[in-house]
Amino acid sequence: MVNIVGEHATAHLRYDAPLKSDIEGLARPLSHWIRRTDTAHSLAGDAAMAVRAARPGRIATLILPGETSWGEAGNAELPPLLSLPAKPAPSTARVEQVAKVLLSGEPTLIVFGGTATFGAAPEHAGRIAAKTGCRLATQFFTARIARGAGRVPLERIPYAVPQAVKFLQAFRHIITVETGEPVAFFSYPGMPSLLKPEDCQVHPLIDAGEDSVTGLAMLADALDARAAQPRLQERNRQPAPQGALNPTSIAHALAAALPENAILVDESLTTGRETSGLTAGAAPHDVLQNMGGSIGFGTPVATGAALAAPDRRVFCMVGDGSAMYTIQSLWTQAREGLNVTTIIFANNSYQILKTEFANMGFGEPGPQALAMIDIDRPRIDWLAMAKSMGVPAVSVATAEDFHRRMIDSVKEPGPFLIEVKL
């Protein structure tokens, strides 16, 4: 990603005008590369350098003083074209050490992140699992996962600390691929920060920035697993659910409605807690998740996904509290005619904050605490909100209606919003 940030003209900065700020100081914690362009003449070259620096997974910030918009560029100086260096493979010693662990017969889990959760990497991992009996999983939050029928299934380490500890308690070895060892998202009284057992060893195999496809192929070769047949997810064609809306019926309806090659943006938090397991056998799709713990990630990411892949339908699952942060994304979707189905789970509360309140041992929140996390005074009219931004919308109160409306949303191009009343 390249961020281009405008600044006052250089000569104007000395007057401490409004909007003057330490842009570099603000950008530094969030950028891998920062440059301030001095003249219009150097702008083209600096922009090219920013693009080069902003390879996948990295952020470049280019600061442009006002005079770069009106100055004479002349013959712009461009840097020579250079191809990006190939990702390095992990060391042979690391691969051989991990191979010994997998051949030891002790319970082992491989945890994947980064670019290792889609493309060819999971296929190599599936062969390794078929050969050795190890299990494959992702962190609870993973940027992108290829899921669905015909793909190598990856388990998901639970979010809640007690469930995560239980999930990991049987393993004596954890192998990491483009991620670190599992840790709790927050610290809670009386609960551990490290989720693995004390006698469980962690073995880094592939670091972030290294080539997971090559590294896992090397490991498969070291295990003589290239010919092994990975277990692939079977298609689960359950009938569409009927009756009341709850996390289970919502997940079943979604699994039945997802078209092939869809993109599922998941910021459903509490209501979507059953989605991961119950959509595993849906049609092949990609899941995009929030990596930073922010609120309001869903609708902008769905907008970007639809712009990047206009031939694929995007489903965005988002809570009503989260959606209020970035609901203006609907206007962009309408303006650009983007193929996004936004699903608003309307429980009229920041339910995730109530859960975290309870996790701290505070019990039930009182009136003052509830006043900060309930959003029902006034209650948000999501249909009117969507209509005001040019997006058609419906409200559903049963599982069968929810399923039918998701199917209908795919039949016509452009954005659509479904309010799920809870």
Regions found by a protein language model. Give the residues of each.
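Active-site diphosphate/adenylate-binding microenvironment
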Residues: 231-311
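Thiamine diphosphate
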Residues: 11-19, 274-422
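Short, flexible loop segments at the rims of nucleotide/cofactor-binding pockets, characterized by
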Residues: 12-13, 39-40, 84-90, 150-157, ...
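Active-site flanking residues adjacent to catalytic metal/cofactor-binding acidic residues
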Residues: 6, 177, 266, 319-320, ...
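Short glycine/proline- and acidic residue-enriched helix-loop micro-motifs
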Residues: 30-33, 81, 230-243, 368
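N-terminal alpha/beta PP-like core and its mobile active-site loop of ThDP/TPP-dependent enzymes
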Residues: 1-227, 257, 340-342
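Structural motif
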Residues: 173, 263, 313-315
